[in-house]
Amino acid sequence: MKKCYLKIVSGTALAVMFLFASCHSAYEVTKAEGRMQPIDSTYDVAPDAEAMALLAPYKAKIDSMMYRVVGTAEMSMDKGAPESLLSNLVADVLRGAAAQVLGKPADMGLVNMGGLRNVLTEGPITCGNIYEILPFENSLCVVTLKGVYLKQLFESIAARGGEGVSGVKLRITKSGKLLGATVAGKPVVDDKLYTVATIDYLADGNSDMTALIQAEKRDCPPGATLRGLFMDYVEQQTAAGKKITSRMEGRIAVED
């Protein structure tokens, strides 16, 4: 996939503007030009030989780690709203990982689609594949919040068209309205406490998940990165002779 960045070709006038800004100069930018520069395998077809030689021993070591096969995916899994195989799987892993804090899975698992950056393809799973899917240093956070705020969380998920969830079922409209929600098949009770296993990024209220800020309690075990938890899950399933799989279960149903 080609990626682009904006390259300023004519920036002299801009530099002059900053230089004289404190003097209230009459200089003004009259023209700015730029072009899109594709950044792909053709951008630098002749790598620097000296740099390559310097990096070679490090690359060999990294490659030996990144290409290590840790499991097998039963099918290809991608992300996508309102529900997807990959987001269901990762949300399940988070929910199960809450056992290290609670002694049992959380009531709900939650991961944002934006945190899943690649496809898990059918076949061998390498460490590198997991880094491609989960490149961020997100960590497990288990938050405890009242049902009234859990409903607000569901409304935010509905407004975004769906996110990765586990342990709950939502009914939403195409326009992003919440029609109904259940936790473990039961309606949400406003004053009851519920546990949500998510990542620190969302627990901080990012990606519109502001309801999580209202948590009564927040537990974030040190060193429990989402990537590490997912790696552990894959290796545990593999040791048990199982392939990595997922299912579409109608966790978020869109109704007219």
Where is each model-derived feature located?
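Feature captures C-terminal
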Residues: 25-40, 89-91, 95-97, 103-109, ...
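Bacterial N-terminal signal peptides that target proteins for export
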Residues: 2-13
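Acidic/histidine-rich, surface-exposed loop or edge segments in extracytoplasmic proteins
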Residues: 64-81, 209-215
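Post-signal peptide N-terminal segment of mature Sec-exported envelope proteins
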Residues: 32-54
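A conserved active-site cap/scaffold subdomain adjacent to cofactor or substrate pockets
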Residues: 84-85
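C-terminal motif of bacterial Sec signal peptides marking the signal peptidase cleavage site
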Residues: 19-22
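N-terminal, Lys/Arg- and Ser/Thr-rich interaction peptides
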Residues: 47-74
